[in-house]
């Protein structure tokens, strides 16, 4: 049975690691201290934390294990689960403490917890087995299993699984986490290894530790990049330990049978958890995979912290515990608040640079102490049943005993009750105890009186002697002693008489019951072992008989003396005899008790069959003793004494007779034994005589043989030889027989044991067979039950999902109806209000009062739909806001007409209640607002303090490095020139000043830490404000009021933050431009000075000295400069490291020319005639970096996307944007005139202009697309800035300071309302290095005013759809736009063209427009997502953008045509609708997805059968086979497993291969024939994969991402072929025709590419692709 749940708190130990050498060198101070002898740690000056264990810097591994873990291992043998997990920041010593980082050269004293626990475990197992064998018990059986899990990037990996691919760590694992019926957590799909010895376990630990993911960061050389959980399962089968009471009960039950051992099975699991450390990316310097791992680690630790907070915070214990937020907390569920003894080891760093991490760790650890676990013993069901039956047996035995003793009775009606005798016995026992106390008190009184009598009698005798003149002190003492002895003897005599009287009565009763004890059976000859024992027993019995006879004589003599002394004492003593007789009786009673005890012992030795009767006699004797005492107190007559002595004599006489009989029996037995002995001896003598006669006969025969002389000597020798041979053979036979006899005797002796063992084993086998049959039957039943349960649950889940879908559909319908009703109701209310004003007009004054009152009290907000609509109206038409406020206020103030006649009364009540509620709500809102403001200010203060502390730490680190450099320089100078050098003194003085600065900074750090601690304490105290009470006390109306204000405050705060951010970005852009300009001017100045310095040595020396002084100073903002790797430096480094720029310019430091750089360098600006050489040199250097150059680094050059709009190609063609416009124009003109570079496109020049004009563009950032546009468009991309393309070429000539009026107009209104201009396809300028490019951009199509979302093409035509609500048709032969297909309700998200029918299909919101472009752009039909068909245009072309989707419709994300053009498939919602284009009818739907279908592609399997592949936001890809004429709902034929980690964005089919791109940045390759995954690239791009396409004429896959990068992949090997920057904004679509590739992007252009240098999917030229990346 499971033991009662025992609440055990999570125990917390804090371990402070020693300081690292690096921290000591950098001057880090220790900010922790430990109270000696107390588990208390101080952080900073006075912030104390108390834990269960605290281990200081000098603590050893053995100490930690002994104090914390040893008890948990012992508890595992009793069936208790245990967990040890190390928690703390990275580099705090968790892996070292746990011992999961296996090191071969580790010393024994440095071994971690796991190694010591394993040794302790197996040592205890051996000890328990040895102890059981010594005690004669069956040894316990142990089964030890081990598991080693790793939680990497929220995926559970099995470190014991040797078959898994170590490189595929990001692949989804098949391990599942489940919870059993008792709340325990177990895993499915994990490798479990059975181990029997310590070396095996250590080998398993070693293998798992070597497979664990580790990497190097700036804070830790070998940092754990995953959470590790090493689990040991111990299963123990042992003999059930029994208590003394159970032993006694069992002995009574099985006293006649052999004892049977009962076994119990205990299980326990021990988790050793090594958590990865919490990280700050700034400090670890993690990028790429390391950064993702750090984010995943922090997410898991955040979930763990939330669980600890929910369990440890007393106010949150009733709330939900978020175990399922992370797999880490799910695995540790039973360790935190479950069935486990848990110890948390918080590892912290003592250095002050880790102050905040240490503080947070200690806070979480302190909170974890409040977690209560419910610990219980883990037993199997059989052991639980045995324990339950034992307790039941014990209870029933107690109940049976109570029935036997009469405590419980059952009356006539069957009702159980307590017997009155029990209560009476309890009362009598109480009374008996009281009487015993009284007797004891009376005994003390008697002793005192006896002493007093003795004293008085002795004094009286002394007086008599004194009168006679014979008084002497010795005589008086002698008299006193005699009198005392007489008194004692008299008391003993009285006691003996009373005892004898009782014994006489008992004997009389016993004789009447059984006159003979039949004791002869006890002394029967069968029991007596030998004659000696029998003789001894007889002698003892005779001695006892003699003693009894002597005692009888003494009793007779004493009786006579008593009679004589009685006569004398009656005449002398008088009244005092009563007390004396009492004392004498008591003394005699004591003597008689001793004698009686001796007699009892003798009788017990002789008569063993009557022990029970003697116990009853003793009880009666005790009762009679009390009666005897009472009688001795009452009667003192001599007749009673005589009667007692006579009874005693009779008793002794009876005993003598009995013992005489016993002696006679013993003597008879002895005589019989002697007779048997004599007969045995006679028979023995007879056998000996017979043996002697046989020997004599043998000798006589031999003598006769020797006396025969007739035989010859030869014959005698022959006979003798034969006889000797026979004799020798017989001797051998005799020896053999003797050996066989011994063996036979031994076998006979062992046969019984073997038979017993055989029977026992046969019984065990039969029991095991029965058990096996029973278990198999039970397993089958359980499996059948589980199967039925699973099927029932699946049906229930399916039904619930179906019901949920129905409810959701009904809910959407109801919401739409509600919105319509609200609109109608609002209009009706306004009409009613207007009619009332006409009937009963109100004065302006009164109306103004009402308006002001309602506006000041902030009338409750309307419904969400109306508020959203009013929000739109307010933002788009701010001028009408004040006009609309008064009518709306009146509508809200006046209630709707009611059917009864009490409208005015109802109105007054509602109005007064609303004012009162508003006032109360306003007070509550002010309280909450103040609290929110306080929290914000506290967090800002703490954040500022942390920033100050980090700044101080950086300063201290910088000063420490400078001091180290000076120290090394001093040592060098001392070695070279001795200590007498003056420079040594200067260096020492400078070092002293640096030390003083470091000390000052340390004091500042300490003050900052103290302030942070005070703020933390204030925050903790402030959190106790009962804000929840205020919220709980709110009514529904007040809650709406508060929610409205919270929403308004959130919007205002967000607006303020956005404005501040925009201002910051503008200022950053200006600052960066200023810095670049300043740097360029400084470089020009230095260049001029350097030319002069060649002629002036003093100036040269001065410049060199300045360079040396500036060389030693590192950049102030080292982190920022390290993160921004590009040609432009960060603001912090630009101003402070002028020397590096100057040295680069002078050639003293060679710049690291990176392969991707295509910007004009400063050397090229200064030496215009050498630019070609520089570019060639850079190209040559770039060619060494390999075929694949990374593109992402081009985005990390320190500029934001909004502040640096110039692409890499523009930077090559134009001057740096930081230079003034004149310089840029001069350089551009010179380059055009001298080198004849082709003129860049208008967009290119416009970008260069717009960068300078950025502040003005910031003000017009708002567009009418809004948030709803981005939510409706398939892939959410960064918002693009709407610009007007009215006069692209003239805009370049506008002066820099004058804003564009047309642009302002474009931003104020929708772009579709402006004049539609024809687009044009321009040739794209060729650049250097394009020969190594796999794709070459040959043309660019410009004409859309907003982002291009979709594209389709043939060999002659190009179709593009955009956010500007138009679809343009382009002629690829002439390069002109030939038509624009109308204005759509919203964004055109998909476009398809049918070659067979010349129809164009465009998609916008829930509509599909069908265009016939053979004669003119004419919409012939409109299809809807619900399956409706309308001739012509169903949605009229409105001037405003339509965001709302009609009720019953859903957003259409993409459409696709089958190869024959007969069927159209439209992805709307989570289904795909099929359209028969011959009849323009909807024939059915493809269902099965749980999320919206984002993309689809169609292929033809055979004639009349289409293959449709769909990708959804639910991460899954499904395949449908649709035959011609299929109707209704079609289910998927296959689901591709495993799914992506995020929604699917693009699909492409090539033969039997399917390619899928997802928002998880990965691309997967599937086999359509085998329906399985072939290959995958988890991080193919650094952002969403938005589009896929196949390069025409080559087995190459092209992928485009949201970052604007294009990558090429070999279709067969799935190896990357190349990458390039396709656009400066997200790529939305890719399509191909027979010769070209088309890419559409958010930059409002479509680029046309041609395959170049591709042969069979490989690059023909091994040159670097970086040139093309930069050029594009």
UniProtKB/Swiss-Prot annotation:
UniProt keyword ATP-binding, yes or no: yes
Keywords: Acetylation, ATP-binding, Cell projection, Coiled coil, Cytoplasm, Cytoskeleton, Microtubule, Motor protein, Nucleotide-binding, Phosphoprotein, Repeat, WD repeat
Extent of Polar residues compositional bias: 853-869, 1198-1207
SMART domains xrefs: KISc (SM00129), WD40 (SM00320)
One of the protein's GO biological processes: regulation of axon guidance
Coiled coil: 365-840, 933-1021, 1055-1085
Domain Kinesin motor: 9-371
Residues given in the record as ATP binding sites: 88-95
Secretion signal, residue range per the UniProt entry: none
Phosphothreonine sites (modified residues): 1662
Protein's cellular compartments: Cytoplasm, Cytoskeleton; Cytoplasm, Cell cortex; Cell projection, Dendrite; Cell projection, Axon
Tissue/organ expression: Widely expressed, with highest expression in brain.
Start-end of each WD repeat: 1343-1380, 1383-1421, 1447-1485, 1488-1530, 1539-1576, 1580-1619, 1622-1659
Pfam families attached to this UniProt entry: KIF21A, KIF21A_2nd, Kinesin, WD40
Region of interest called Disordered, as start-end residue ranges on this chain: 556-646, 780-808, 836-886, 1109-1139, 1172-1315
Region (Interaction with KANK1 and KANK2): 1142-1169, 1148-1169
UniProt biased composition (Basic and acidic residues): 560-597, 1247-1264
Primary location class: cytoplasm
Subunit field text: Part of a cortical microtubule stabilization complex (CMSC) composed of KANK1, PPFIA1, PPFIBP1, ERC1/ELKS, PHLDB2/LL5beta, CLASPs, KIF21A and possibly additional interactors; within CMSCs KANK1 and PHLDB2/LL5beta seem to be the core components for recruiting microtubule-binding proteins KIF21A and CLASPs, whereas PPFIA1, PPFIBP1 and ERC1/ELKS serve as scaffolds for protein clustering. Interacts (via residues 1142-1169) with KANK1 (via ankyrin repeats 1-5) and KANK2 (via ankyrin repeats 1-5).
Domain notes: The coiled coil region interacts with the kinesin motor domain leading to autoinhibition of the motor.
Family per record: Belongs to the TRAFAC class myosin-kinesin ATPase superfamily. Kinesin family.
Protein name in UniProt: Kinesin-like protein KIF21A
Organism: Mus musculus (Mouse)
């Amino acid at each position: 049975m499971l033991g009662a749940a025992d609440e055990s708190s999570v125990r917390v130990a804090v371990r402070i690691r020693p300081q690292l050498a690096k921290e000591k060198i950098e001057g880090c101070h220790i900010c922790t201290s430990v109270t000696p002898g107390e588990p208390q740690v101080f952080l900073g000056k006075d912030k104390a934390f108390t834990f269960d264990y605290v281990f200081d810097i000098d603590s050893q591994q053995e100490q930690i294990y002994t104090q914390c873990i040893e008890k948990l291992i012992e508890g595992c043998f009793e069936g208790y689960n245990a967990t040890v997990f190390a928690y703390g920041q990275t580099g705090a010593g968790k892996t070292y403490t746990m011992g999961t980082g296996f090191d071969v050269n580790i010393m024994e004293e440095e071994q971690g917890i796991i190694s010591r626990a394993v040794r302790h475990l197996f040592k205890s197992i051996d000890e328990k087995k040895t102890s059981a064998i010594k005690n004669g018990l069956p040894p316990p059986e142990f089964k030890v299993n081990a598991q080693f899990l790793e939680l990497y990037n929220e995926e559970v990996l099995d470190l014991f699984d040797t078959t898994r691919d170590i490189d595929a760590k990001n692949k989804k694992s098949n391990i599942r986490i489940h919870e059993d019926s008792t709340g325990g957590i177990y895993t499915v799909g994990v490798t479990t290894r059975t181990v029997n010895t310590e070396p095996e376990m250590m080998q398993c630990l070693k293998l798992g530790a070597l497979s664990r993911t580790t990497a190097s960061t700036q804070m830790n050389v070998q940092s754990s990049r995953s959470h590790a959980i090493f689990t040991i399962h111990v299963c123990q089968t042992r003999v059930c330990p029994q208590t003394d009471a159970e032993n006694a009960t069992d002995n009574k039950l099985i006293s006649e049978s052999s004892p049977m051992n009962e076994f119990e099975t205990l299980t326990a699991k021990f988790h050793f958890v090594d958590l990865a450390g919490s990280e700050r990316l700034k400090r670890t310097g993690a990028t790429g995979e390391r950064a993702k791992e750090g984010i995943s680690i922090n997410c898991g630790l955040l979930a763990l912290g939330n669980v600890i907070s929910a369990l440890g915070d007393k106010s949150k214990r009733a709330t939900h515990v978020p175990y399922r937020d992370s797999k880490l907390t799910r695995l540790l569920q039973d360790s935190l608040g479950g069935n486990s003894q848990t110890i948390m080891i918080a590892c912290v760093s003592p250095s002050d640079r880790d102050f905040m991490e240490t503080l947070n760790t200690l806070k979480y650890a302190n909170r974890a102490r409040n977690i209560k676990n419910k610990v219980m013993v883990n037993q199997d069901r059989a052991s639980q049943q045995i324990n339950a039956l034992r307790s039941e047996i014990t209870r029933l035995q107690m109940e049976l005993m109570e029935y036997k003793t009469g405590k419980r009775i059952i009356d006539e009606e069957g009702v159980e009750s307590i017997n009155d005798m029990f209560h009476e016995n309890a009362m009598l026992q109480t009374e008996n105890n009281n009487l015993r106390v009284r007797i004891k008190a009376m005994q003390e009184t008697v002793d005192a009186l006896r002493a007093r009598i003795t004293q008085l009698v002795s004094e009286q005798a002394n007086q008599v002697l004194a009168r006679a003149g014979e008084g002497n002190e010795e005589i008086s003492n002698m008299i006193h002693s005699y009198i005392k002895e007489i008194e004692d003897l008299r008391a003993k005599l009285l006691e003996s008489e009373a005892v004898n009287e009782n014994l006489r009565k008992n004997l009389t009763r016993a004789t009447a019951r059984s006159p003979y004890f039949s004791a002869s059976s006890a002394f029967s000859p069968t029991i007596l072992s030998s004659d000696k024992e029998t003789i001894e027993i007889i002698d003892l019995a005779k001695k006892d008989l003699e003693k009894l006879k002597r005692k009888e004589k003494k009793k007779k003599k004493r009786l006579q003396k008593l009679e004589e002394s009685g006569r004398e004492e009656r005449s002398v003593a008088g009244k005092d005899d009563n007390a004396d007789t009492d004392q004498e009786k008591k003394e005699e009673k004591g003597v008689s008790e001793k004698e009686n005890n001796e007699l009892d012992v003798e009788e017990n030795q002789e008569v063993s069959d009557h022990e029970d009767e003697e116990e009853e006699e003793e009880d009666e004797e005790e009762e009679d003793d009390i009666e005897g005492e009472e009688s001795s107190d009452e009667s003192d007559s001599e007749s009673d004494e005589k009667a007692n002595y006579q009874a005693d004599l009779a008793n002794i006489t009876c005993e003598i007779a009995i013992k005489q009989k016993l002696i006679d029996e013993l003597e008879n037995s002895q005589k019989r034994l002697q007779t048997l002995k004599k007969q045995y001896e006679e028979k023995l003598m007879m056998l000996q005589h017979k043996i002697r006669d046989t020997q004599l006969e043998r000798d006589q025969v031999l003598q006769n043989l020797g006396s025969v002389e007739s035989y010859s000597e030869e014959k005698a020798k022959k006979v003798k030889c034969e006889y000797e041979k026979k004799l020798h053979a017989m001797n051998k036979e005799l020896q053999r027989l003797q050996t066989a006899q011994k063996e036979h005797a031994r076998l006979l002796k062992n046969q019984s044991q073997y038979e017993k063992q055989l029977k026992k084993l046969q019984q065990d086998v039969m029991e095991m067979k029965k058990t096996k049959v029973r278990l198999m039957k039970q397993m089958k039943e359980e499996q059948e039950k589980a199967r039925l349960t699973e099927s029932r649950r699946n049906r229930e889940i399916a039904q619930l999902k179906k019901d949920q879908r129905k409810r959701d559909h009904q809910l959407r319908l109801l919401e739409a109806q509600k919105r319509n009703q609200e609109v109608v109701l609002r209009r009706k209310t306004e009409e009613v209000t207007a009619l009332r004003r006409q009937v009963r007009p109100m004065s302006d004054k009164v109306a103004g009062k009402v308006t002001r009152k309602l506006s000041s009290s902030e009338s409750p907000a309307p419904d969400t739909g109306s508020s959203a609509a009013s929000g739109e109206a307010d933002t788009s038409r701010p001028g009408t806001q004040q006009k609309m406020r008064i009518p709306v206020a009146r509508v809200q103030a006046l209630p709707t007409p009611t059917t009864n006649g009490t409208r005015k009364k109802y109105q007054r009540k509602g109005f007064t209640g609303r004012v009162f509620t508003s006032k109360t709500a306003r007070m509550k809102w002010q309280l909450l607002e103040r609290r929110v403001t306080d929290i914000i200010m506290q967090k800002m203060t703490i954040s500022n303090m942390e920033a100050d502390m980090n700044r101080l730490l950086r300063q201290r680190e910088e000063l420490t490095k400078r001091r180290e450099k000076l120290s090394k320089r001093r040592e060098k100078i001392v070695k070279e020139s001795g200590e007498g050098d003056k420079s040594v003194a200067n260096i020492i003085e400078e070092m002293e000043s640096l030390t003083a600065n470091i000390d000052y900074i340390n004091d500042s750090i300490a003050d900052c830490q103290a302030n942070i601690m005070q703020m933390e304490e204030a925050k903790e105290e402030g959190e106790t404000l009962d804000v929840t009470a205020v919220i709980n006390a709110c009514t529904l109306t007040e809650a709406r009021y508060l929610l409205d204000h919270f929403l308004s405050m959130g919007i205002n705060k967000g607006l303020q933050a956005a404005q501040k951010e925009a201002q910051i970005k503008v200022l950053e852009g200006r600052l960066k431009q200023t810095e670049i300009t300043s740097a360029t001017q400084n470089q020009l100045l230095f260049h001029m000075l350097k030319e002069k310095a060649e002629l002036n040595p003093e100036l040269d020396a001065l410049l060199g000295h300045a360079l040396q002084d500036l060389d030693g100073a590192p950049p102030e903002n080292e982190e920022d400069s390290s993160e921004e790797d590009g040609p432009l430096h960060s603001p912090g480094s630009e101003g402070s490291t002028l020397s590096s720029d100057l040295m680069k310019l002078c050639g003293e430091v060679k710049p690291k020319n990176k392969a991707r750089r295509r910007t004009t360098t400063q050397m090229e600006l200064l030496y215009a005639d050498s630019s070609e050489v520089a570019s060639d040199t850079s190209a040559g250097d770039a060619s060494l970096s390999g075929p694949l150059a990374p593109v992402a680094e081009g985005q990390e050059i320190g500029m934001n996307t909004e502040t640096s709009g110039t692409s890499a190609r523009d930077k090559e063609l134009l001057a740096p944007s930081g230079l003034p416009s004149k310089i840029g124009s001069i350089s551009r003109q010179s380059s055009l005139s001298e080198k004849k570079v082709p003129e860049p496109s208008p967009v290119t020049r416009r970008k260069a202009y717009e960068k300078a004009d950025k502040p003005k563009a910031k003000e017009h950032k708002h567009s009418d697309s809004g948030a709803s546009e981005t939510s409706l468009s398939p892939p959410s991309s960064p918002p693009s800035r709407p610009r007007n393309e009215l006069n692209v070429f003239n805009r370049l000539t506008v002066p820099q300071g004058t804003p564009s009026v047309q642009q302002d107009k474009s931003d104020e209104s929708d772009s579709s309302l402006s004049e539609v201009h024809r687009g044009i396809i321009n040739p794209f300028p060729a650049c250097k290095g394009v020969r190594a490019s796999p794709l070459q951009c040959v043309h660019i199509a410009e004409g859309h005013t907003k982002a291009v979302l979709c594209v389709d093409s043939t060999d002659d035509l190009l179709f593009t759809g955009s956010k500007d609500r138009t679809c343009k048709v382009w002629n690829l032969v002439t390069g002109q736009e030939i038509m624009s297909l109308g204005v759509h309700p919203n964004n055109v998200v998909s476009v398809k063209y049918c070659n067979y029918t010349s129809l164009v299909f465009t998609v916008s919101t829930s509509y599909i427009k069908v265009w016939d472009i053979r004669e003119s752009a004419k919409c012939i039909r409109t299809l809807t997502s619900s399956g409706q068909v309308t001739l012509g245009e169903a949605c009229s072309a409105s001037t405003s953008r339509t965001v709302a989707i009609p009720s019953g419709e859903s957003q259409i994300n993409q459409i696709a045509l089958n190869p024959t053009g007969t069927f159209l498939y439209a992805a709307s919602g989570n289904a795909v609708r099929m359209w028969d284009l011959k009849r323009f009818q909807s024939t059915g739907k493809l269902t099965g997805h749980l999320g919206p279908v984002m993309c689809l592609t169609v292929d033809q399997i055979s004639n009349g059968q289409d293959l449709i592949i769909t990708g959804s936001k639910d991460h899954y890809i499904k395949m449908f086979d649709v035959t011609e004429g299929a109707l209704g709902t079609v289910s998927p034929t296959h689901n591709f497993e495993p799914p992506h980690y995020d929604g699917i964005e693009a699909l492409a089919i090539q033969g039997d291969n399917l390619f899928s791109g997802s928002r998880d940045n990965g691309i997967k390759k599937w086999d359509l024939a085998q329906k399985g995954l072939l290959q995958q690239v988890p991080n193919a791009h650094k952002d969403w994969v938005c589009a896929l396409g196949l390069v025409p004429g080559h087995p190459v896959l092209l992928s485009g991402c949201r970052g604007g990068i294009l990558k090429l992949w070999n279709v067969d090997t799935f190896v990357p072929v190349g990458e390039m920057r396709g656009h400066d904004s997200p790529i939305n679509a890719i399509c191909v025709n027979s010769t070209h590739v088309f890419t559409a992007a958010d930059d409002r252009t479509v680029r046309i590419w041609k395959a170049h240098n591709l042969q069979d999917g490989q690059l023909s030229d091994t040159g670097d692709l970086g040139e093309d990346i930069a050029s594009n």
